[in-house]
Each structure stands twice: as C-alpha cells, then as structure tokens.
From Swiss-Prot:
Belongs to the Lgt family. Catalyzes the transfer of the diacylglyceryl group from phosphatidylglycerol to the sulfhydryl group of the N-terminal cysteine of a prolipoprotein, the first step in the formation of mature lipoproteins. The chain crosses the membrane at residues 8-28, 49-69, 79-99, 109-129, 203-223, 232-252, 259-279. Pathway: Protein modification; lipoprotein biosynthesis (diacylglyceryl transfer). HAMAP family: Lgt (MF_01147). It is an enzyme of class 2 (transferase). It comes from Fusobacterium nucleatum subsp. nucleatum (strain ATCC 25586 / DSM 15643 / BCRC 10681 / CIP 101130 / JCM 8532 / KCTC 2640 / LMG 13131 / VPI 4355). Keywords: Cell inner membrane, Cell membrane, Membrane, Transferase, Transmembrane, Transmembrane helix. It comes from the Bacteria. This is Phosphatidylglycerol--prolipoprotein diacylglyceryl transferase.
Length: 288
C-alpha cells in the first residue's frame, strides 16, 4: 500500500486527491444528468456544483482543524496540507449547506431544490472518497482478531499475536466479539500503522464505502422515482441515510472526534436525523 500513485521528480500525486477528483467528476456528471431529465438550467447546476464542492472542502477542513486545534497550533503549516488527510465529513456537509444557502439566495432559488439535485451525487462521492482514506491508512477501525488479514509490514509482535490466536480452539475463537474475516494491517508510515503497528484493524473506511453505495442505490433508484415529492425530499433522505451509516461505522472507528464524552459523529448524526424527519413530515408538495 502506497498513498502516492504517481511520482514525477519531486512532485507526488496522491490517491487521496485522485479519489476526490473522481468523486467531483462523477458527482457533477450525475447532477447534469438530473438537470437534463428535469429540463433544468445546466449552467446553474454546474455553478452550484463548484460552490458546493469548494464550500464543502473548506467546511470539512475547518471542522477537522477545530477538533484537533492543539496539533494544528503546533504545526500551522499542516493546515493547508490536505493531501495528508484530515477532512471531517460532517464539516463538509455543514460547509456545503452554507454554500448552498448563499448560492440559492444570490440566484433567488429554493435551496432545497438544489439539495435534491445534490443528494445522489453527494453520497456516491463520499463512497469514492473513502478509497482515498484507505490508501492513506486513515479513518481506520479498532484492532480485531481475524484469521485473515492484508499484511504490509510484518514484525515479531504480529507473529506473537497471530500465533496465539491460531492456538485457540474453535469454540474459544468464537468468544471474540470482534472476529471478522477481513482485518487489515497498515504500513507503519500511515496513521493506522503508526497507532497500531502490525495489528489487524477493522477497515472502517471500507465499511462506510459499502454503506454509502447502498445509500446511493436507495436514493438514486428508489427514492428518486417517487412521485409527489416535497421540496427537499431527496436531500432530507440523504441526510438520514448518511447519518445512519455514520453512526454504524463510528462504532468500529478508533479516532473519531469527541464532543465531551460522546463521539461527535453520533451527536451530530442524531441531531441531523431528528431535523430531517421533522422537515420530511412538514410538507408534501411536489418538487418537479
């Protein structure tokens, strides 16, 4: 595993950035597809996509920095080093919402209609982005006993752990609640590998990738075809589906941002779900 997919002299191109670029391209393409289906202004959709992407990136980065402020105060040059990772998806959502509200006010359009366009592209883009997290060895899960793992850097500590596990009886192995057949051992140069060298971890970022793909299927192939949708119908369902996904994945993640003694993603996700359900029930007007 190597976070760099291409190196030309001193210039390094990272998978992290590549996945974001692919996510942006796919998201904009899907947004334009919806616009054509609904006879919507293509230029407006493209301009909105640009604003949503930029505001989402800024929001995601600021959110992450605020929750890790001591580190960035000591390492201020790392603030702009986004290729090292460090984006918070809830911050990205909040930043995207802020950008949407500003854009909608300038263009004098209902922001919920823009949200309906963005729902499918957003969650698919988030799924693609998790591949970049995997290549960076970040947003990883907790250690797990597992009979199989992808090993990139082996040291005696792992052999001792694995030998002990293999010596257990089948019934004893079944007593481990975290037993899964797909643990991943990351390079020690990565955040996951430096924190848990030579230990198999839950690939939490891949769990989220799968859940987001399922969420995209629900939004794109089921909810999108529902008639008599209210303004924001697709957007609020996107918030609910992604928030549920995030709550599930957070149980496996090890470095989630904390809000007092609670995981910040759990707190924010529950609030977002409650708000979304409220607005879904509030109106039942057809969008388009």
């Amino acid at each position: 595993m190597n976070p760099v997919f291409l190196k030309i002299g001193p210039i390094e191109l990272h998978y992290y950035g590549l996945m974001y670029a692919i996510a942006f391209f796919v998201g904009i393409s899907l947004g334009k597809k919806i616009a054509k289906e609904r006879n919507f202004d293509l230029d407006l959709v493209e301009n909105y996509a640009f604003v949503a992407i930029i505001s989402g990136l800024i929001g995601g980065r600021l959110y992450y920095i605020l929750f890790n402020l001591p580190y960035y105060l000591q390492n201020p040059f790392e603030i702009l080093a986004v290729w090292h990772g460090g984006m918070a998806i809830h911050g990205g959502i909040l930043g995207g919402i802020a950008g949407t509200l500003i854009f909608a006010k300038i263009k004098k359009i209902n922001p919920l209609i823009l949200g309906d366009f963005a729902a499918g592209p957003f969650i698919l883009g988030q799924a693609i982005g998790r591949i970049g997290n995997f290549m960076n060895g970040e947003v990883h899960g907790v250690p797990t006993f597992t009979p199989f793992s992808v090993i990139f850097n082996v040291k005696p500590k792992f052999y001792e752990w694995y030998t002990y596990y293999q010596s257990l009886s089948i019934s004893d192995k079944a007593n481990y609640p975290d037993l899964v057949p797909w643990g991943v051992v990351f390079p020690t140069s990565s955040p996951a590998g430096s924190e848990f060298p030579n230990l198999a971890l839950h690939p939490a970022m891949l769990y989220e990738l799968i859940l987001n793909l399922i969420g995209f299927f629900i939004i794109w192939f089921i909810l999108r075809k529902k008639e008599n949708k209210a303004s924001g119908y697709m957007w609020w369902w996107y918030i609910i589906i992604y928030s549920i996904n995030r709550i599930i994945v957070s149980f496996f993640r090890v470095e989630d941002l904390m809000f007092f003694n609670f995981r910040a993603p759990h707190v924010i996700s529950i609030i977002l779900i409650a708000v979304s359900i409220f607005f879904l029930k509030k109106d039942n007007k057809k969008v388009f």
